[in-house]
Amino acid sequence: MTSVTVRPSATTLLEKHPNLRLRDILDTLPRSVYEINPLKAWSRVLLSVAAVVGCYALLAIAPWYLLLPVWFLTGTTLTGFFVIGHDCGHRSFSRKNWVNNLVGHLAFLPLIYPFHSWRILHNHHHRYTNNMDEDNAWAPFTPELYDDSPAFIKAVYRAIRGKLWWLASVIHQLKLHFNWFAFEGKQREQVRFSALFVIIAGAIAFPVMFYTLGVWGVVKFWLMPWLGYHFWMSTFTLVHHTVPEIPFSYRDKWNEAIAQLSGTVHCDYPKWVEVLCHDINVHVPHHLSTGIPSYNLRKAYASIKQNWGEYLYETKFSWELMKAITEQCHLYDAEHNYISFAQHQKR
């Protein structure tokens, strides 16, 4: 994949730092990157609210031939809501958890996303990044698992690992985040609250929208912007950890420090996307510590590049990049890293 800057491998990192711990990397970061600034946090809320309101006003008056780009733009602004809730889920939006929970639930509500289930599952992803036994975000099938799967599962997996990658987060959201029985104890109560909050709000809002706007109005003002959001949700999360050079590891060989530093891709997007999505693409520092607020990610990444730059993966968003990922990174073989479906069929 020519668009990825390939650094020395994780093996090289371990050879040079055989006793490397995540704490050793974190100790090189300035303490200021962890500082929570209420003014900056709420300024990002205001930016997203203004952007979403502006896009919906534009959507209301846009002629039919401009609907597609306006839907896409509106979905991008809604992704800003997700990133605000993302900070809340990592407790880096506010020092007060009740504020994080309140803002997180409200930010996720237009996306019909239960906050606590996402928070818990996403933190599990952070704890076990690129661990084949534990990671719940874009962990690839092995050839053996794929071969043993029912035909329907194979078809869905081929679709979301191919040209329909942008729908993967829809499946992830609906499959994992409404089932509170998959959680235990206090977490089950929290997830049930978040799921019911979304379900009850939807049970009120959707009939009102259908009654006042009609079917086309719901498609125009909710479904298409929501799919625009999921385009970015799927794209960001796929690119964060998926290039042929980045390995997944099984539990017995997994190293936390290597997974967080060299298992995450830094990808540059068009500036307007980065602004509206609050720098969610600056993902390496966020994986080293979830306590870094989104507005401090660039400062943190500058420090990481200075101290650990030779072990980072960097790329720039392009359709060539997405084509390469969706045509190559299908199944995971511990010996060869990713192989494509076509390569697997020839074996």
Swiss-Prot record:
It is an enzyme of class 1 (oxidoreductase). A motif (Histidine box-3) lies at residues 286-290. The keyword Membrane applies. GO terms for biological process: unsaturated fatty acid biosynthetic process. It is a multi-pass membrane protein. It catalyses: a 1-[(9Z)-octadecenoyl]-2-acyl-glycerolipid + 2 reduced [2Fe-2S]-[ferredoxin] + O2 + 2 H(+) = a 1-[(9Z,12Z)-octadecdienoyl]-2-acyl-glycerolipid + 2 oxidized [2Fe-2S]-[ferredoxin] + 2 H2O. Its cofactor is Fe(2+). It is found in: Membrane. A motif (Histidine box-1) lies at residues 86-90. CDD domains: Delta12-FADS-like. It comes from the Bacteria. Its EC number is 1.14.19.45. Pathway: Lipid metabolism; polyunsaturated fatty acid biosynthesis. The histidine box domains are involved in binding the catalytic metal ions. This is sn-1 oleoyl-lipid 12-desaturase.
